[in-house]
């Protein structure tokens, strides 16, 4: 599977990329900024979207797919729990096994290379417990300062417990783009040493939406014997297909509540990483031959996990990644063109273009001289749009990297494919009214 997040957009129709975007730095011909998807058809899959408020807080959590809800309802109505060995129980087990295989294939993994958990935060903590026996105070961990706290806290905890040195990997900026932080291998290489055992970063920044060059990072990390790359994919998977084999990561984690599903996480661990580095934290009598056997503590939530298979089918077959990428690129283009047209009013963070090889549909900014929290509150209380403000559960990227002037952080607007051109244009008008007329 070709990963749009790491490729040259071979899977995207380049003639359909909208005005204001570029592919590999080359400007494209102007095309109308219109919806790429059939809005009514897509929204028929999301019952919650029938209200008057447009969800522009999707990086915090998306609405749930109808077919996923129905899958859970059907399972709980139809199957016994816990399952036994009778025909009905075996039918339930077959459904569960098929779901797990489909989820694994979604990221080009094998079924014994994935496990489910409560959240990405929880799964990284469990992974830390599993890796703990092969770490000591002579090791070093490299952690990106662009990490969401979920991708940092497990390793900070381990470093404190074991006396491990943490080296902070700062993003690169330029004098011409001081508000556009990007992770590069050039800034990573000086931090690596023969003692480095873990490098952790996110695939996409949940704060500014920038796509990081994970395969390039993996190639550098793996020049150090015994060094592993741990990637937080939460902000990537709603927007791009992911191929963990192509990325050559050791561990990759994401959350389904950001992907039109339940509050559930999935962790990938390569077979090589499992065999070389991981210790089972499960009951002594549970086989540790799979990732489930090593990390899946207690009885799994079958009813929630079965929500994932319909989501995979919807993304890959009903809508398709090509249209998802194109729709979101149009939406980002409209918002960025508005924000960047008023440089004295808005300070925009991250990529200043909508090139889908460089960013996803997360746009962060602050209003000059205004409280970000106040701006977001004024938008939200009008009940037409739902946006977020603050630190996005990422204090280091917010305060240490971006350094907003507002004492209460940033304003974040995040789209997915079910958002529309009409909504974004209306949002720009409403935001303009709020920042220019409201006091």
Curated annotation (Swiss-Prot):
Top-level lineage group: Eukaryota
Residue segments, region Disordered: 1-25
InterPro entries assigned: Aminotrans_V_dom, PyrdxlP-dep_Trfase, PyrdxlP-dep_Trfase_major, PyrdxlP-dep_Trfase_small
Keyword Nuclease: no
UniProt pathway: Mycotoxin biosynthesis
GO MF terms, alphabetically ordered: transferase activity
Function of the protein: Cysteine desulfurase-like protein; part of the gene cluster that mediates the biosynthesis of the secondary metabolite ustiloxin B, an antimitotic tetrapeptide. First, ustA is processed by the subtilisin-like endoprotease Kex2 that is outside the ustiloxin B gene cluster, at the C-terminal side of Arg-Lys, after transfer to Golgi apparatus through the endoplasmic reticulum (ER). Cleavage by KEX2 generates 16 peptides YAIG-I to YAIG-XVI.
Protein name per its UniProtKB record: Cysteine desulfurase-like protein ustD
Species in which this protein is naturally found: Aspergillus flavus (strain ATCC 200026 / FGSC A1120 / IAM 13836 / NRRL 3357 / JCM 12722 / SRRC 167)
Record gene name: ustD
């Amino acid at each position: 599977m070709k990963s749009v997040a790491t490729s040259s957009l071979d899977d995207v129709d380049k003639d359909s990329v909208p005005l204001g975007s570029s592919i590999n730095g080359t400007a494209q011909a102007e095309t109308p900024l219109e919806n790429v998807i059939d809005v009514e058809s897509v929204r028929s899959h999301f019952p919650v979207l029938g209200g008057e408020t447009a969800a522009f807080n999707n990086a915090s959590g998306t609405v749930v797919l109808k077919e996923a809800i129905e899958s859970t309802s059907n399972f709980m109505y139809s199957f016994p729990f816990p399952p036994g060995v009778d025909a009905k129980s075996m039918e339930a087990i077959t459904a569960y096994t098929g779901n797990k295989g489909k989820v694994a294939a979604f990221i080009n993994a094998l079924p014994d290379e994935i496990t489910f958990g409560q959240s990405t935060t929880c799964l990284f903590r469990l992974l830390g417990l599993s890796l703990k026996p092969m770490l000591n105070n002579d090791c070093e961990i490299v952690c990106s300062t662009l990490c969401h706290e979920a991708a940092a806290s497990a390793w900070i905890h381990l470093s404190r417990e074991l006396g491990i040195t943490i080296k902070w990997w700062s993003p690169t900026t330029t004098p011409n783009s001081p508000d556009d932080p990007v992770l590069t291998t050039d800034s990573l290489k000086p931090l690596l040493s023969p003692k480095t055992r873990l490098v952790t970063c996110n695939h996409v920044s949940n704060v500014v939406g920038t796509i990081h060059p994970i395969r390039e990072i993996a190639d550098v990390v793996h020049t150090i014997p015994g060094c592993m790359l741990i990637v937080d994919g939460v902000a990537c998977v709603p927007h791009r297909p992911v191929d963990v084999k192509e990325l050559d990561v050791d561990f990759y984690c994401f959350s389904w509540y950001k992907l039109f599903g339940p509050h559930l996480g999935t962790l990938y661990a390569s077979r090589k990483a499992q065999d070389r580095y991981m210790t089972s934290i499960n009951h002594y009598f549970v086989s540790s031959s799979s990732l489930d056997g090593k990390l899946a503590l207690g009885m799994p939530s079958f009813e929630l996990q079965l929500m994932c298979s319909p989501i995979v089918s919807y993304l890959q077959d009903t809508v398709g990644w090509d249209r998802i990428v194109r729709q979101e690129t149009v939406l980002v283009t409209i918002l960025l063109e508005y924000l960047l047209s008023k440089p004295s009013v808005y300070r925009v963070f991250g990529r200043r273009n909508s090139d889908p090889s460089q960013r996803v549909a997360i746009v962060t900014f602050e209003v000059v001289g205004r409280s970000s929290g106040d701006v977001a509150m004024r938008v939200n209380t009008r009940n037409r749009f739902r946006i977020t403000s603050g630190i996005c559960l990422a204090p280091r990227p917010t305060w240490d990297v971006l350094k907003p002037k507002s004492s209460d952080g940033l304003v974040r607007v995040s789209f997915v494919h079910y958002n529309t051109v009409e909504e974004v244009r209306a949002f720009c008008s409403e935001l303009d009214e709020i920042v220019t007329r409201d006091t």
